[in-house]
Design a protein with these regions (language model features):
Chain B
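Flexible loop/turn segments at secondary-structure boundaries
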Residues: 64, 129-131, 154-158, 193-197, ...
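Histidine-centered catalytic micro-motifs
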Residues: 56-66, 236-244
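Active-site metal-binding motif and surrounding structural segment of the metallo-beta-lactamase
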Residues: 38-53
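Histidine/acidic residue-rich metal-binding segments in metalloenzymes
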Residues: 166-190, 194-388
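Conserved beta-strand scaffold positions in the cores of enzyme catalytic domains, especially
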Residues: 7, 42-46, 146-148, 185, ...
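Active-site microenvironment of metallo-dependent hydrolases
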Residues: 1-25, 29-30, 39, 65, ...
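Divalent-metal coordination cores built from histidine and acidic residues
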Residues: 59-210, 558-575
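Active-site neighborhood of phospho(di)ester-bond hydrolases with catalytic His/Asp-centered motifs
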Residues: 53-60, 122-124, 278, 313, ...
Length: 267, 576
């Protein structure tokens, strides 16, 4: 197991597209070779070495490569995007698309992330100690194939459009969420430990949502069916169980229609 | 660019227009044209061990206009598959960012065609009302020369004239519309069917009645064919037939083709056909439903082979995730009901409509696999490759950037079998098609006929494109293929056609080693039929605008000069 340390030396004038900052790209390369890897700043092709000092060599494979960014990446996009194994740790904040399309490995951001964190993710794990902006684990704009697998855990709060078109995997937001949770989802699980303003599960076909706080405005397409006790991410509680979205088509299994389930902690 | 002298030395030249098949020859270029010889100071391009062909000619592709743009808006996710967005080389040469896969940006469209060595592309469906937009996009597409076919098959004026079989009036209307829209010829999409779609109906057979207009698809087709020959246009009618994409549609296809029997081509451009039947793959199916869906490519081609006054293009399914878009509005709604993906529809006043739906052609879905085989079979059953052209009906059956892959499949049985072997329903595909039993492998000469000499002749453009004879435009593509020692690995054929070693457009080197070097000097071609005015038609058109049947006034309808700033106008003297 090798660790490559990137230390930020300069704040990019425009956002820097750090699509090369993945264990897959670093594997098998020396520190000097890693510093030569490309990234765009606007329309200009720059090098990682223009913004970071690099120390340590990559491991033989992505799985043997850890990346440690010892500083802030508020203006660096695509950290860990499309990675398949290994790990990336960012000591500060990160910009958009952290762990987007990732298939495996782990990304840890100790600060906040911007939008599109874990977009269309297929596997692996993303942990954010701070908060996230919008579109956590959602589908790319226009696409109808969202997050398929893996785990995203945001310790702080998140904005809107969480898990849009989700098909699988788990998203846990420990703080509050604004609006649009699991819109169009056909699978997967979202756990919100704080409150949600509204629009939870709109046009949702299948999948699970747990809200441990309050939903200020419920969607009219959800119907309360019973009250159940469940343990969710280490918290045991009694939930009001809703099914929906009743306005949407639903698949049948063994002659019965399958609905999405929304569990809201009983007050 | 003009002036510079260039000589392409020592390549294996393939030019069906001069019956040259792999002879080692030099090609001389001066002032943007091919010439007999040049001076000793000419720039030398070494083509030794490489294949030299004319620039490619694409007879049918949806690359510009409101329909394509609606597709771009509907599918932002298509940009995820753009490939190389911004190479450092591109940046150095100062050219524009590329985006999109099945509906590429105008810049990517021009660059990708140029990288494949294509010189001319026909935009296959221009709604006349939207012609200004089509021309703006054409103008913004670098390098390649383009023209656009306005759609006539569901036009209210045309249907009014043809229900009384007024061919001369129809011709006068066509002549007017080609002029004001800067169009090239007569496109017909689902004749009568798209008009019927305004009533929620369709025309699936030749004798179905179009609601309100009291006319049939057959009358529209024969009437427009007569009007086209009356005018003597460079291209024939260009037909997307009725009942596209449905099981068991091949008898309608053959019946439509039969309408050309006995009709003679009348033009001064060397065109011999009176009907071009486009994306024939979508029209060559048997079976009573999707369960019994099968290829009828052999039956259709048996007819095409003996009927000399028709030409076809393939519309090959390339097994990609793509975006379907056509003026066949009812078909797109039908497709949306089949695949449940997002759908949009556009209605163009008195003229036409369009629908758009994303589509994923999967080798493991039986009907898609049969479609894949059907497209290739059409070419493999064809006897006259000069009447059979390679297309993917871009982007409907696949993006145009897959032409090299289609060429590979046509040239190499092993590569076809390799695809077949990975199909989930291989045995069922073999039962429903002929592809497994066909051993034919096309050669480079036949590929040059299908992509160069053939389409240029069918478009009436053989005096500019499609060959390497002196006097033609100096559009020359050089591919890294050894004619005498063709690669055993079929992937190398695809790679060679994907990125030309060189492409010269109008005598200027625009691509080298598959990289675009310059934006070139593109032209927009349109046809100007000089027909005497018929007062009734002039009155009908101005009355329609005056009464407000259109949302624009007649003075805002034509395409202004500035929208097509590099025109090449083909004048047609109409002898009544």
């Amino acid at each position: 197991m090798e660790t490559v340390t990137l230390t930020p030396t300069k704040t990019p004038e425009l956002m820097f597209e750090g699509y090369s900052i993945t264990p897959d790209a670093f594997a098998g390369k020396t520190a000097a070779e890693i510093a030569e890897l490309p990234g765009h700043e606007g329309k200009i092709v720059m090098k990682l070495g223009d913004f970071f000092t690099v120390s340590g060599n990559g491991g033989a494979t992505a799985a043997d490569t850890n990346i440690h960014i010892a500083g802030d990446c508020t203006r660096v996009k695509y950290i860990g995007a499309r990675m398949t194994a290994g790990s990336v740790t960012v000591d500060g904040n990160a910009d958009m698309y952290v762990g987007g399309w990732m298939k495996g490995g782990k990304v840890l951001v100790k600060g906040n992330v911007d939008s599109f964190c874990g977009i269309q993710m297929e596997g692996g794990e993303i942990e954010v100690l701070g908060s996230a902006q919008n579109h956590v684990g959602c589908a790319y704009r226009g696409d109808w194939r969202g997050m398929k697998g893996g785990l995203i855990r945001i310790h702080g709060k998140a904005g809107n459009d969480i898990g849009t078109f989700m098909l699988g995997g788990t998203i846990i937001i420990e703080g509050d969420v604004f609006i649009h949770v699991s819109t169009h989802a056909e699978g997967g699980t979202i756990i919100v430990k704080g409150d949600v303003e509204g629009r939870v599960g709109g046009q949702m076909v299948k999948g699970e949502i747990y809200v441990l706080g309050k939903i200020m405005y419920m969607m009219p397409g959800f119907k309360k069916v019973d009250r159940v006790e469940k343990e969710v991410d280490g918290v045991k509680a009694v939930f009001d169980h809703y099914i929906g979205d009743l306005g949407e088509r639903h698949p049948k299994s063994k002659g019965k229609e399958v609905y999405a389930n929304l569990y809201v902690k009983a007050q | 660019m003009s002036g510079g002298e260039i000589i392409i030395k020592g390549g294996f030249v393939i030019d069906p227009t001069q019956k040259i098949d792999g002879d080692v020859k030099d090609i001389a270029i001066k002032d943007g044209k091919i010439v007999e010889k040049v001076g000793s100071s000419a720039k030398v391009i070494d083509a030794k061990g490489k294949v030299v062909m004319a620039g490619g000619v694409d007879i049918h592709s949806h690359v510009a206009g409101p329909k394509v743009n609606a597709g771009r808006l509907l599918r932002p996710e298509d940009k995820l598959r753009s490939g190389t967005l911004r190479s450092s080389k591109a940046q150095k040469n100062g050219y524009r960012m590329e985006s999109g896969f099945s509906i590429p940006s105008v810049f990517k469209t021009g660059y990708d065609y140029a990288r494949m060595g294509y010189a001319f592309v026909m935009e296959a469906a221009m709604p006349p009302l939207m012609a200004p937009h089509v021309h703006e996009e054409i103008h913004d597409t670098p390098i390649i020369d383009e023209a656009a076919l306005p759609v006539f098959g569901n036009n209210w004026f045309i249907m009014e004239y043809l229900k009384n079989h007024e061919v001369e009036n129809t011709a006068a209307y066509i002549a007017w519309l080609l002029k004001v829209s800067k169009g090239y010829g007569v496109k017909i999409v689902n004749p009568g069917g798209t008009a019927a779609w305004s009533w929620g109906l369709n025309c699936l057979k030749l004798d179905d009645q179009v609601p309100f207009f009291d006319i049939t698809p057959q009358e529209i087709l024969t009437g427009l064919m007569e009007a086209n020959e009356y005018l003597g246009l460079p291209h024939s009618i260009h037909v997307h037939q009725n009942n596209l994409g449905n099981p068991g549609n091949y008898p309608v296809t053959i019946d439509s083709l039969k309408l050309a029997e006995g009709v003679k081509a009348r033009n001064k451009f060397g065109r011999e056909q009176v009907m071009h039947s486009t994306h024939l793959q979508f029209h060559s199916y048997g079976g009573e439903g999707w369960g019994t869906f099968c290829s009828k490519a052999k039956e259709v081609m048996d007819y095409v082979n003996k009927q000399k006054n028709i030409t076809i293009d393939l519309g090959c399914v390339t097994l990609d995730e793509t975006t379907t878009m056509t003026a066949d509005g009812p078909f797109e709604h039908h497709l949306h009901a089949l695949n449940h993906l997002k759908w949009t529809n556009v209605d163009v006043e008195l003229e036409t409509a369009a629908g758009i739906v994303p589509y994923i052609y999967s080798k493991d879905v039986l009907p898609n696999a049969v479609q894949w085989a059907t497209g290739l079979e059409l070419a493999l059953f064809a006897k006259d490759m000069n009447r059979t052209f390679i297309t993917t009906d871009h982007p409907n059956a696949g993006p145009f950037t897959r032409y090299p892959r289609v060429i590979k499949w046509l040239m190499n049985k092993k590569s076809r079998e390799a695809v077949l072997a990975t199909m989930k329903n291989m045995d069922k595909v073999i039962d429903a098609t002929n592809i497994h039993t066909i051993d034919r492998e096309l050669n480079l000469y036949e590929i040059a006929q299908m992509t160069r000499s053939g389409p240029a002749k069918a478009l009436g453009l053989a005096h500019i494109y499609g060959g390497l004879a002196p006097g033609l435009d100096a559009n020359v593509s050089i591919f890294d293929l050894n004619y005498k020692d063709m690669p055993k690995d079929p992937e190398k054929i695809e790679a060679a056609f994907q990125r030309a070693a060189y492409f010269l457009k109008s005598g200027e080197i625009v691509v080298k080693d598959g990289e675009v070097l310059t934006h070139g000097h593109k032209k927009t071609i349109w046809v100007n039929p000089k027909m005497k005015e018929i007062p009734q038609v002039t009155r009908d058109v101005s009355e329609a605008f005056r009464k407000g049947t259109y949302t624009v006034g007649i003075s805002n309808y034509p395409v202004r000069e500035y929208l097509a700033p590099h025109p090449m106008v083909i004048d047609v003297d109409v002898e009544a």
